[in-house]
From Swiss-Prot:
Residues 103-131, 192-203, 211-247, 259-272 have a biased composition (Basic and acidic residues). Residues 20-42, 82-283 are annotated as: Disordered. This is Uncharacterized protein R871. Residues 135-156, 165-185 have a biased composition (Basic residues). It comes from Acanthamoeba polyphaga mimivirus. Belongs to the mimivirus L41 family.
Length: 561
């Protein structure tokens, strides 16, 4: 409470001092005004007089307001004195009332100060406006009423009316200020929510946004930014991945090689690179330089393959090649008029241009008959080897009609073929050797029907096959050796459902299931076991009596075949 009393005392002293100064100035002004008018020149008097009057009006407006403030302060100080000490009872309620009154007085004084300042600004601005441009200045309503009040009304009534109107004007001005704050904001505060507000608040929800911000999500970007993701790159960068490389790099894999390397697939390589022997390389023979030059591809016409071109050069012995083509075949006419036909580097014999048939003698002495480029000969062997073996071909594959062997070896081996595959009809062996081995084939695979062996080897074994696989049904062995060993097979795997899959003459018994060995035992020849070897052999001999008479049976079959 002491601090509150001290504050109010200071306020009261300040207002008293200000009232005393204002009264002193108001007393001295009427005396100083005539001196100013006297000292001024006649031209300056009319200009100074309105200014002086306006200042007097302002002082008159301010003076009653200050008197009211001082009166309220005096009353307030008297009430404080009447209250007494702060420790007396009821001081708490009184202090609250005093605070409320002090707040009200401070608000009134602040409002009066604001009104006075605004009136001064309005008067100064109305004087500085349009008179310099030749226009009549717009005077404030308060000034007109002030003049009329001098003529018709008293000064006190006029001042009170001015104060009321100024307070109304102050309230309207505050409303304008509030609307101004709402309608016209600074750019930073107006766009705090990242939007462009319109000029009026009525269209805040139906406003049209700016072009740049309205299309923020789907706007047309600038050329530089729009092409940032899918732009056409500059030529140097666009060609970085799929550019046409420079000639040295572009031709690194598929370049046009030099003549020596370009002819690498067709040139005659050296013996060391091809792995050939001197006997198998024709260009290593003693030939003239001109022919050797042709062999290496130095003389070409229209870049055709070497074998399609004849030689037009002249050998040292006087032979000349003629440019005559018949299916890669050309002729050579000697000086004595004899004609020699060539196919590439090979001399051909018995050439018939009509049928295009001829034969070539190979380096090993074999003769091969051709029809065009295919090995073929009608009713005669197409290949006759140097050792006497004869082979029949029909259009480049083994074949012979009338159930005759396609291969007749010099040792008596006979092999039958049908359409290039070893085979024979009517359940006859397709391969017969001089030692009595017979093999049955069907379409190039071991096969025989009617539960008969597909391989019969003398003194060794009988073998049953089905479509190239060792197989026999009805729980019978697929392999029977002459010595008595027996083996059971199912689809080329050792297998037997009941009993051992392998029975040897020495008494060894082995069980197999689908090619996997299960167990093995040895049977005694003296004691009676489940699988007596003697009983098995005797049973087999009863079923297959030709095992005992193998030699006579083999000779008989050879005579029949």
């Amino acid at each position: 409470m002491d601090s509150i009393f001290s504050v109010f005392k200071l306020f009261s002293e300040q207002f008293k001092a200000s009232n005393i100064q204002e009264q002193a100035t108001s007393d001295t002004k009427p005396e100083s005004s005539p001196d100013i008018n006297l000292g001024c020149s006649p031209n300056i008097k009319p200009e100074c007089s309105p200014n002086i009057k306006s200042s007097i009006d302002v002082v008159e407006d301010i003076y009653p307001s200050t008197q009211l403030a001082t009166q309220s302060l005096v009353i307030f100080s008297q009430e404080i004195k009447q209250i007494g000490s702060p420790n007396s009872p009821g001081t708490h309620d009184v202090s609250l009332n005093l605070k409320r009154k002090s707040d009200k007085i401070s608000e009134d004084t602040d409002q009066e100060r604001v009104v006075v300042c605004e009136s001064l600004e309005n008067k100064s601005s109305s004087k500085d406006k349009s008179p310099s441009r030749g226009r009549s200045p717009k005077r404030h309503k308060s000034s007109k009423k002030h003049k009329s009040s001098k003529k018709h009304k008293s000064s006190k009534h006029d001042k009170s009316s001015k104060r009321d109107k100024s307070s109304k004007r102050h309230k309207s001005h505050k409303k304008k200020d509030k609307s101004h704050k709402k309608r016209y904001r600074s750019p930073s505060s107006d766009r705090s929510l990242s939007r462009d507000r319109s000029s009026s608040r009525d269209r805040s929800y139906k406003k049209r946004r700016l072009y740049s911000r309205d299309r923020s999500l789907s706007r047309d970007r600038s050329l530089s930014r729009d092409r940032s993701l899918s732009r056409d790159r500059s030529p140097p960068r666009d060609r970085s991945l799929s550019r046409d490389r420079s000639p040295p790099r572009n031709r690194s894999f598929s370049r046009y090689r030099s003549p020596l390397r370009d002819r690498s697939p067709t040139r005659d390589r050296s013996v060391s690179r091809d792995g050939l022997t001197p006997e198998s390389t024709p260009f290593l023979r003693s030939v003239s330089p001109v022919r050797r030059r042709f062999n290496f591809g130095k003389v070409l016409e229209n870049h055709l393959p070497r074998e399609n071109l004849p030689l037009t050069s002249k050998f040292g012995d006087g032979r000349i090649y003629r440019n005559k083509f018949v299916n890669n075949i050309y002729s050579v006419v000697l000086d004595d008029g004899t004609k020699i036909w060539y196919r590439g580097e090979k001399i051909i014999h018995d050439y018939n241009p009509t049928d295009n048939t001829y034969y070539i003698i190979m380096d090993d002495g074999a003769k091969i008959w051709y029809k065009g480029n295919l090995v073929h000969r009608d009713e005669l062997p197409a290949i006759i080897c140097a050792n006497g073996t004869k082979k029949w071909y029909q259009y480049n594959q083994y074949d012979r009609e009338n159930d005759l062997p396609s291969i007749v070896g010099n040792d008596g081996t006979l092999v039958w073929y049908i359409n290039g595959k070893i085979s024979r009809l009517n359940d006859k062996p397709a391969h017969i050797t001089p030692n009595g081995t017979q093999k049955w084939y069907k379409d190039g695979k071991y096969h025989r029907d009617n539960d008969m062996p597909a391989i019969v080897e003398p003194y060794v074994v009988y073998k049953w096959y089905q479509y190239g696989l060792k197989h026999r049904d009805n729980d019978l062995p697929a392999i029977i050796n002459v010595n008595g060993d027996l083996c059971w097979y199912q689809h080329d795997k050792l297998h037997r459902e009941e009993g051992p899959a392998v029975i040897c003459k020495n008494g060894k018994l082995i069980w197999y299931r689908h090619g996997e060995k299960i167990r093995q035992t040895t049977a005694s020849t003296r004691g009676k076991n489940e699988y007596e070897y003697g009983d098995i052999i005797s049973e087999l001999y009863d079923r297959f009596p030709y095992i005992l008479t193998w030699n006579s049976w083999n000779l008989r079959n050879q005579q029949n075949n």
